[in-house]
Amino acid sequence: MPELAHFHTNGQLPLNPPSLVSTSLTTSYNRPPSYPTYASSTPTANDQPDTDQVVVQIQPTSSSKPCHVPKPSSSGLFSRLAEYFGLSSDKGAWSRAKQGDQYKDQAEALIEIDSLSETMSSAEYWNSGNSDPSSWSIEEQDARSIPQYVLDYAPYVHLFSGEEFWPCDIAEHLTHITPKLNYTPIYKMRRDRTLNNLEELNRVGGRSVYLTSNDNVEERPDWLGGSSNIPEDVGSVMTNGTERPVGRSSAPAVLVVVPKEDGIVDAFWFYFYSYNLGNKVLNIRFGNHVGDWEHTLVRFKDGAPVQVSLSEHSWGEAYAYSAIEKIGKRPLTFSATGSHAMYATPGLHPYVLPLGVLHDQTDRGPLWDPSLNMHSYTYNLQNGALLASNHTPQAPTNWFYFGGRWGDKSYPSSDSRQYSFAGQYHYVSGPLGARFKNLGRANVCQGGGKCEIRYWLPPPGMAKHISPEQLQETVDTDLDVDSLTDIKD
């Protein structure tokens, strides 16, 4: 085992991407009952202090259906919330956009997104890396090797039975977005964003670049739902003439294996969803965002699994491997409906914020085996280099170095889809990517504070208290980037 230090560098790799074009894949899923949509208005200069560029907003088509978002318009609702939080019932205490003009027809959109060529499949994108395994030296083969024990102890995930937003493929996600510098489209780079050229956006604005949905997310475009990626958990099925094994999802997981000091190897299993549906307080939903990265970390010591860390909003829990429920010898985890926060048990998971009590919910829904469809990599902490592994040698690496957000920027107060209360927003900014999930962590916990390893599973309904300080804590950054603000995963 190599002796590797716990530090990071920028680790930029040469950019020689082939000329690729995007493909548009579509999915369908059962939408919830329709509710009235909100009007929208163009952001004002006061709503975007970090850019002085012209604001352009993508307009949705009229064919999409409205989404299921409760509209906080009645005075009774404001009174109930004010009473609940001990605040004035004056609506002036709330930040809520006035109803403005309805969305214009697509023909009147401020910009037109050109149709992307549909010449490559998602699988072809994932095999578009330019590494040649036949040229690997013995040392490089070792550097790219995934230990068999990592796969032997790969986690299972029970998705929620009533989930509306299933796992998604980041290659497909890129076909539905326009990169923006804050709220301004990056015209010269808006087309053909692929897994092999995404890092080029770092030259424009770094963390101020947002992969912004081409659609109005309140109308629930099908690609957000990912229903074609629901894993089959009863027997095997035939898909396009080929057998699809039990537990396999069409949405690939991303495995990043990180060797560390003293025989430690961390195996990060990353899961991507195109949409995060926030939780409710008194039937008001907070924390929606486009793009959602979650992960399970299995830590090994000298080849044996010793601990498991589960991502859960911005904090998460860590367990001794012996404490986790298993199928055979593999850990069993549970993904919460909407938020996709990871838990070790099924049931209700309340957590107490300054705003009030929110709940995640998990159950034994479709069983997902991420190891059946994954793209795997090794990550070197000394030079920050991500390498496609011996299992998926053609997997591209450029996307990993993208430093911006995988979703829209938090909508401004002038956008009628947005509202806030007690510092919490209905829509928040999309998350940073897998690179920024503290891959170099010394202990197994996600955050930088005290790391508590549980040797038992919590009882159902055990509440977790989250302090304002924890909410402000920046925990999903790597040591090779500056401190970040506006992190709301």
Residue ranges and their predicted role:
Residues G291-H295:
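Short, surface-exposed coil-to-beta transition loops
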